[in-house]
A protein has these predicted regions:
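Short, solvent-exposed loop/turn and secondary-structure capping segments
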Residues: 6-8, 43-48, 99-104, 158-161, ...
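Short amphipathic alpha-helical segments and helix-helix/interface helices
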Residues: 17, 73-77, 177, 240-244, ...
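Short, internal active-site loops enriched in acidic
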Residues: 37-41, 94-97, 151-156, 194-199
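Short secondary-structure boundary/capping segments
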Residues: 47-52, 103-108, 163-165, 205-209, ...
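Active-site neighborhood of glycoside hydrolase catalytic domains
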Residues: 124-146, 153-263, 274
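Aromatic/acidic polysaccharide-binding cleft in carbohydrate-active enzymes
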Residues: 251-300
């Protein structure tokens, strides 16, 4: 989206961004979701530390990629100038490949952008990777309001992905919250970030609730683990009410849907009606505090 926006003239881009984000001259959109590293719409697969550093500092090679420097950050700065209260949530599609293993018991390396598990030995290092990202973005004038530990943690097949069932996300979330606390970060953590039907994996049903129960409420940074995020690529949105009823103390947000095609405008009204019913109203009426769609601006 940011690449496409940067292909516009500055005047046209400014007019469009005002139409979307301005609270006085536009729709007042107040939340944006970005990837922490590459996503399935990026120019290529990458993370911010593709080459491992020394054993004493494995993420010493951390650096933002050109996608962020050339497109994402400039666009975010323009949006923030229009709406300074914009909230930004970031999620990784994959960790660096050198942190991946085929399974957490044998810990055999997994040299692939797709699938794999986070090596338990690198949970703390990966948490520090998040901290570096948040601090670097802050230096650029961009505050990261929230993160999720992993985009679609039950999706093994995405071009950039990491399999992270609740049994593995739970201990990582504790490391992540502790690192945020130690570094005086107020960044919120939304767990899960995937479908209503948990990709039909039996022991992953009610993923957020199982994760909350596993980590408990008495650990460093526990107050930063505020809720769960959902997508709608499988299952029924009634799952939102079910999760709320089990843990009414935790927030819910709806963090991703792809709203499909409009057939050059022929199906626009039908599409907008369906999106209002299923994406907007069905989520906020079932306890979601935010609704985000994916992607903002594609060229095809």
């Amino acid at each position: 989206s940011c690449y496409n926006l940067m292909q516009m003239t500055p005047e046209a881009r400014q007019a469009l961004l005002k139409r979307i984000y301005s609270t006085t001259e536009g729709y007042g959109v107040s939340y944006a979701r970005i990837s922490l590293g590459c996503n399935d719409f990026s120019s290529t697969e990458y993370t911010y530390c593709d080459t491992k550093g020394s054993e004493s500092d494995p993420i010493s090679n951390f650096a933002l990629y050109s996608d962020e420097n050339d497109y994402v950050i400039p666009v975010l700065k323009e949006i923030l100038a229009i709406n300074p209260n914009l909230k930004i949530i970031a999620a990784p599609w994959t960790c660096p490949k050198w942190m991946k293993v085929t399974d957490i018991n044998t810990k055999n390396p997994k040299d692939s952008w797709t699938d794999g598990h986070l090596n338990p030995d690198y949970r703390e290092v990966y948490a520090k990777y998040f901290v570096k990202f948040i601090n670097v973005m802050k230096e650029k004038g961009i505050n990261i309001y929230a993160v999720s530990p992993q985009n679609e943690p039950l999706n093994k097949a995405n071009c950039a992905s990491l399999y992270m069932p609740w049994q593995e996300e739970a201990p990582f979330v504790k490391k992540l919250a502790a690192q945020f606390k130690k570094n005086n970060l107020q960044t919120k953590i939304y767990v899960f970030d995937h479908n209503y039907n948990y990709d039909k994996i039996a022991d992953q049903e009610d993923y957020p609730v199982k994760l909350y129960n596993a980590i408990g409420d008495n650990f460093e940074g526990s107050e930063l683990v505020v809720g769960a995020a959902y997508h709608d690529y499988g299952g029924n949105n009634s799952e939102l009410t079910d999760i709320h009823n089990q843990r009414p103390d935790k927030e819910l947000i709806f963090s991703e849907t792809s709203i499909g095609t409009w057939k050059n405008g022929r199906d626009l009204s039908k599409r907008l009606m369906a999106d209002m019913k299923n994406v907007a109203l069905a989520t906020v009426n079932q306890y979601c505090k935010a609704v985000l769609v994916w992607n903002l601006m594609l060229d095809n």
